[in-house]
């Protein structure tokens, strides 16, 4: 198995554990606390995600970009020093942020701050809620940095182990905390999931940390652009709609939209997590000036992700009418239409992560900042114009439209400015096969009309997708070879089945190559 494939699989395991922790926690909160309290927890978690980019200072992006770059160019000592240097910067930033937050609480009063954080639902236990908010922001900043650092160091096995332990800690703590202490207990459970990666981050800052002045300027410039981009991107990608829904429609609408987003995130996490090794690999190739290798890997990554994310997203949208109530309860059935819209379009946002990795590998974080600024302005405009009038569905369609705009800008930049090619024809073929798959799954759901139809719908959709790949000639010869090599890493029983499937979907391509000119 190639190093890139192994790292991608381990990165997917690590990210999958993180995604499952968030997903299972959201179900636990919904089942134990009810709709209004679920909205309050989702609102606080959104505030945490909004605050973290301010604390991070773009350092997570910098460590994930420059560590593999230095290692790819053979500068291992400089890489180790930079690792410790950036870890210290982040810890100092988090410490300063905690002090500033404490001063703000002292100035405005813990009750006022707690009421704002919970959207007015916190009447008691205001001090624990405020303290938890500060702990969550600092812990999430350290956690995000830790996983970016481990990806940059290409220690994906360690990342997977930490994520697995954190999954168990968070889910068990959220369940227990929700049952015993309500909203504050649930939030304490989320904080428990950040404990291990935070300790790892703190332990990484000890030792020599001096770096070359030229490198320091490059890293600082890159980090500052990423900082601005991450802050503005948070408005577009980190659920800014919750703020407007809370203000105009109340916590019940916040809960509905949060549940819709939770299912969307679950659907895209698997394919998206395979991109965890893309930035490190592209940056490493950039360090060797291997532009042809970068072009080939970019196109292959887009095709591979499209092959995975299209059937998953479209298929999930097809089964959501039965899946969502089965997971969260009938109280959340109003979230079904928004969830179907968000999941259907989420596939394109996953593909855009490959383009973002490419842009960062080429140190063009200035474009990420500029495009994020444009998206943030559109998100704020939609929040004031659409959400007050149309509620949850207005938030869903606004999110989709803005993300499509951002993706369009990114594709234009990759093609016109960077000179890379997007495999449009291959992506369209994969999309067609996935739509046929989703149609088959939807028919099963509509005919049976019961949660028991979900397994049947998944099997039918998968079968139609495999046949569709062969019919539309969607698998490229190079991708077929990649799939064949990948099957050899599986257990023997699974490897034989996977090899037969890979041979089936790529048979038409092979036959075409055997025909005489």
Where are these regions (language model features)?
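Interhelical loop/hinge segments that connect adjacent transmembrane helices in multipass membrane
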Residues: 1-4, 199-238, 277, 281-296, ...
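Signature of the first transmembrane helix
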Residues: 3-69, 98, 102, 136, ...
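Transmembrane helical elements of multi-pass membrane transporters/channels
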Residues: 7-23, 189-197, 213-284, 304, ...
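Membrane-interface helix-loop junctions in multi-pass transport and translocation proteins
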Residues: 30-37, 154-157, 167-199, 366, ...
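Helix-loop junctions and terminal segments of transmembrane helices
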Residues: 57-73, 87, 152, 260, ...
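Hydrophobic transmembrane helix module of multi-pass membrane transport proteins
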Residues: 88-235, 442-443
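Interfacial segments at transmembrane-helix termini and the short loops linking adjacent helices
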Residues: 108-132, 299, 316-350
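Membrane-proximal transmembrane or re-entrant/amphipathic helices at the cytosolic face
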Residues: 442-517
